[in-house]
Amino acid sequence: MKRTLTRVLSLFLAVLCAAAVLSPAASAAAYYENDLPVVYVIGRGTWIYDKNENKIYPTDGIEKAIKNNVNNLATAWIKSLISPNSDWDELSDAIYKLVEEEYKNYVLDDNGEISNGTHIKPNAEPKAKKSNFSITDYQFSYDGRIDPRENAKLLNEYINKVLTVTGKRKVQLIGRCLGSTIISAYLTMYGCSKVDTAIFYAASNQGIVPLSAFFTGDVIFDCKAIEKYGDDYLNNSASDGSDNLSRSLVTLGYKLSKSFYLTDYVIENVEKAYRDIARTLYPRIVLAVYGTCPGFWTMVRDDYYEKAKQVVFEGKAKYAKLIEKIDWYHYNVFQKFPQTLKKCKQQGMKVAVIAKYNIQLAPLFKDCMKQADNLVELETASYGATCSDIGQLLPDSYINAQEKAGKGKYISPDLKVDASTCLFPDYTWFIKDLPHDVFPNSVNELIMKIFHSKEPFTIDSDEQFSQYLQYESNSLLLSKVTELDLADENDSAEISLRKLLNLFNTLFWLLKNLFNIM
């Protein structure tokens, strides 16, 4: 009897073991060699509410406000045109009143503090989870306006909560755009002892030209840059009738002005008008929007910073406390960030950088032809890449010298970027043709590959994720950048013919819609 019972138990255990071995892999939890919670510090902060819980930011009201004030703006414009003093004061005042009204509940006080009860919704309590962490489990939201020291403190508290509920000793950190400035402040203030890996994705923590130039008033109108920007706009715009009427009017006007060589004339007069308007509009327009928000000063580039303070604050003592906040970040975090990151890496924190390129900045700044993702320049987002200008290639002499120095592998196949000059060349990825505000899942796959690797994940770790990747907008997938991208479409007769046909197509579609609404 005892022997029979033993055999039955043995058979039962054997069946259980077989079931465990033969059960489908899909039913088993995925295993990752480095499975840690991911804290995602998003870009731009989050929605902001007034004391009555009405959402005030992000605002969609500027476009609406302009439409609602077309008559006022048009009247002010006409008065400025016929002004005996040939100034634009009427239009400047009208623009300021419109913007000030739209942002009056958003801006902070002269000390860079919230004094009107505006706020964000607090982050949800982190959920208890022990494994299979994803990029969306722990998203840290923040008020992008306030002192980055306050946000770093809140991030530290959030990380501690995540570690408590997960039972882990470290987190993975990723900062996107403005979120990278929060991580920068966090690493400066609290160190990296709780961070396994930090990824900087389309990072703005070394400044961005558009915001910097807005703060200093250094707006320029470069004809060549505007024509290049216009050509890209037309190539990426629909020409099958999906465009709206106003876009087609702009498109047609641009094409005709370029065809008749009027672009220089138009730009010259627009620039003159801007200079006259800016004379009375600065600095009050900056103060009405972002000027009193320490969080936005974190993205003012080093070569613009001192001038920006002079332009915006004009030496006025009432801004002393605000200036203390922004100076702390700029001198202790911004300027020292490369050293901070190197120190963290030496202490064992893994680092990765993902930057984007081949999309021009708005053609209103002196550096607008630099490689960028339409908002952040590649040189700063990658922490030091050497780049050609948009539409250009790195010089042959430069490439030859780099190859002789044994650094040829860091040159992009399209000959536009050299990663060897980056802070971390082996841990920096470049994605071509991916706009700044587009974040496809295909990039998340790369991010999670980096996070799941026990050893530092490099540009050579996985052939699928080589250093230079191309974003395919149709499939939303990534592919390798190849030498085929070297072709310059500007010299193609086929492209020239297509542009000519697009001109007639736009004209035809515009006429058709005009008749439809008449």
For each feature predicted by the language model, list its residue ranges.
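N-terminal non-catalytic accessory region
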Residues: 29-174, 180-232, 360, 367, ...
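Charged, terminal alpha-helix-loop-beta segments
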Residues: 373-374
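Bacterial N-terminal signal peptides that target proteins for export
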Residues: 1-11
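Alpha/beta-hydrolase-fold enzymes
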Residues: 224-317
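Alpha/beta-hydrolase fold catalytic core
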Residues: 138, 146, 277-370, 392
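Sec-dependent signal peptide cleavage junction
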Residues: 19-33, 511, 518
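Hydrophobic membrane-targeting and insertion signals
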Residues: 6-7, 25-28, 199
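Bacterial N-terminal signal peptides
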Residues: 11-20
